[in-house]
Structures are given as C-alpha cells and as structure tokens.
C-alpha cells in the first residue's frame, strides 16, 4: 500500500473511531432515569450553609444536567426548533451509559463496597471510579459556573458539593474552591454561560450564533477533560490494561469532536454514537474476539486499538490536519457533513477522506 493510501485508510479508521465511542443508553429517547431526577434545587437537602448537592448519587448528578439544559434552552433557538436541540444533551446521555455499563461503580478488587452494584446500590456513584471522576469535571464544574453567572437559579442559596472525606483532596466543593483548583476549566465554563445571552440576542445569523455557542461549549468541555485527565489518572491503576486503553481513547477523541463544533443534540448523539462496551473490560479481553460482547462492541474496541497505534505512528498529524481543516464556520459545517457521510453511508469512499481534509485545509 502506498503512503498516501495508508494515510487515507488510517484517517477513515480514526475518525470512525472518534464518533463511535460514546454509546447512548436511553429510556424513551431520554437519558436513563431522566424522569426521576429532580428539576430544581428545592428538592435537595438545604441547611443553614446552603443547598447540599450529592454528586455521588446518580439522580442528583443527573439533576445538575437537567437544570443546565432547562436553563439554557432559552438561549439555544439557533440550534433549531424544539428542546431536544440543546447541545448539552450529550452529557447526561453519556452518564446514562456509564451507569448501565458499570463504569460508575467501585472498581477496587475484592472490595466490600456495594457502591454501583446493580443488585445492592445501583444509583451509587463511586468516588474511586475513573469515569465518575472524569464526569465530575463535566457536571459539577459547569453547574457551579452556571449558578455563578445566574443562568441557573440557586433560589438564593449557596451551592455546596458533598465530597467524601477520604477523597476530599481530589475534588472541589464550591465555585470558589473549583476556581482556585481548576482556574482554566472554570474560566471557560464561566465564559460559555456568560456569553450565552449575548450571543443568542445578537443581530448575527443563526448559523453564526450556533457556531459561536458550540465553539464556546466545546472549548469548555475539552478543557474539563484535559483537567480531568491529570486529576483522575491515579484511578486508572484500579483497572485492566484493555479498560485503560479504552479510557485513553475516549479522552483523546475530544479533540476531533471539539474542532468540528459537533452539534450534539439528542438525535445526532444517538445517530453518531455507536455501541460502547456494555461492561468494564477485563485483563483477558482481546477485541474483536470478546465472546460476551456484541459484534458492534467488539468492532468499536478494535477500532480504538487502531486509533491508539496509528496516532502514535503519525505523531498526531491527523489531529493537526483535522483542526487545520476546521478553520471557519462553513468548514466546520462541511466537517460535520463529512463525518455523517463517512460513518452513516456505507458507500462513502473513506479512502478519499485524507485528500478531502487536505483540500479543505488549503482553502482556509
């Protein structure tokens, strides 16, 4: 195979992997147990010091997402008609998959803890879970920033996040605490929520408003993931090598999604998110031949193996080319359409992807 042919094949494999990584588990088209999550803080414990939010309870973590989406819908008209167009939907959808796949449970071997056990304590989120730790930065941080900017109402109460004493050093518990420990991530979430009203009420076209809002959102999400990558890394020692490899691929894919300003509404999220493994991977698991996982799950894991190997081989040049090609709102719109064709149209010539990206990048 020629070098160009190899690169074209690699590009197709990598980008397919990127958008097949975040499987969505839904109930009636909405995130798992969405209807059970309270819609405002008045349903949570209130003390003299403020509202106590327990992010280690699945329902309360989902409450933060519900409040975020409900509060930002008014600023998302540029995304399209209907409340399912809000691009924040991908966050609670992914949380539902993490719950169902056992990735929010206590990962320690021979543990007496029942946290996350489907039989004993299914809605418990373990502070030792890697995915729960990463999701903390994609739920607690944006929620606190939304309250601080006034986008989400706290009913006049201070919002305090409960953190178990044994892991208190690993998690922040208030807006000021999070801003001190993670200033870059909090600043980008603050900017996102602070800019929503201004962008949505501007005289700009809906096309440009949409691109601006998505750009701000993905910049905040990517910064949160980068922050979480360092903060949660010790927890990866509790998992098998295949699971850690999968975790890293899941993290690294954010660069592709972010650069394209992907509009992650409910429909698009479900359409672009192919099946992820339905359980935590064990040391003996070797995709694509894991007997108790589906063909689709094995395929996704196999592609992730390719992604890691080829990214190392190319030294990150595919990510750089992708970012270079996504140089304008129009280019990013083309990029999303390109991903749609690549992934959802079996007749699409994936081998042409590299040349398409090269042409797009030179026209910037």
From Swiss-Prot:
Detected in all tissues tested, with the highest levels in serum (at protein level). At mRNA level, only expressed in liver. Keywords: Developmental protein, Glycoprotein, Secreted, Signal. It is found in: Secreted. Its main location: secreted. Residues 1-22 form the signal peptide. GO terms for biological process: digestive system development; embryonic liver development; liver development. Glycans are attached at residue 70. Disruption phenotype: Morpholino knockdown of the protein causes a small liver phenotype. Morpholino which can simultaneously block the translation of leg1a and leg1b, causes a more severe small liver phenotype with hypoplastic exocrine pancreas and intestinal tube as well. InterPro entries: Leg1. One of its GO terms (cellular component) is extracellular space. Pfam families: Leg1. Important for early development of liver, exocrine pancreas and intestine, probably through cell cycle regulation. In liver, its function is partially redundant with leg1b function. Belongs to the LEG1 family. This is Protein leg1a. The lineage of its organism: Eukaryota, Metazoa, Chordata, Craniata, Vertebrata.
């Amino acid at each position: 195979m020629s070098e160009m042919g190899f690169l074209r094949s690699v590009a197709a494999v990598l980008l397919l992997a990127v958008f097949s990584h975040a499987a969505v588990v839904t109930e009636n088209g909405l995130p798992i147990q969405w209807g059970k999550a309270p819609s405002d803080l008045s349903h949570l414990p209130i003390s003299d010091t403020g509202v106590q939010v327990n992010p280690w309870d699945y329902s309360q973590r989902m409450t933060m997402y519900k409040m975020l989406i409900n509060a930002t819908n008014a600023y998302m008209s540029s995304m399209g008609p209907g409340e399912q167009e809000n691009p924040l939907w991908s966050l609670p959808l992914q949380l539902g998959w993490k719950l169902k796949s056992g990735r929010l449970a206590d990962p320690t071997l021979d543990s007496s803890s029942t946290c996350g056990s489907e039989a004993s304590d299914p809605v418990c989120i373990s502070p030792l879970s890697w995915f729960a730790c990463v999701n903390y930065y994609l739920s607690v941080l944006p929620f606190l920033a939304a309250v601080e900017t006034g986008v989400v109402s706290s009913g006049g109460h201070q919002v305090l996040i409960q953190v178990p004493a044994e892991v208190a050093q690993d998690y922040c518990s208030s807006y000021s605490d999070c801003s001190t420990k993670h200033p870059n991530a909090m600043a980008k979430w603050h900017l996102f929520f602070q800019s929503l009203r201004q962008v949505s009420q501007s005289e700009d076209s809906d096309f440009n408003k949409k691109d601006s809002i998505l750009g701000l959102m993905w910049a905040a999400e990517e910064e949160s993931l980068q922050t979480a990558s360092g903060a949660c890394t010790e927890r990866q020692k509790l998992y098998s090598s295949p699971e850690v490899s999968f975790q890293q691929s899941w993290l690294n894919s954010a660069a592709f999604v972010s650069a394209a300003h992907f509009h992650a509404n409910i429909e698009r999220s479900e359409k672009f998110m192919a099946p992820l493994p339905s359980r935590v991977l064990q040391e003996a698991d070797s995709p694509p031949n894991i007997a108790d996982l589906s063909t689709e799950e094995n395929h996704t894991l196999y592609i992730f193996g390719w992604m890691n190997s080829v990214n190392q081989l190319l030294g990150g040049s595919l990510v750089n080319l992708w970012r270079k090609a996504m140089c304008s709102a129009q280019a990013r719109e083309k990029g999303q359409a390109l991903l749609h064709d690549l992934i959802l149209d079996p007749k699409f010539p994936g081998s042409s992807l590299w040349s398409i990206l090269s042409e797009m990048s030179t026209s910037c």
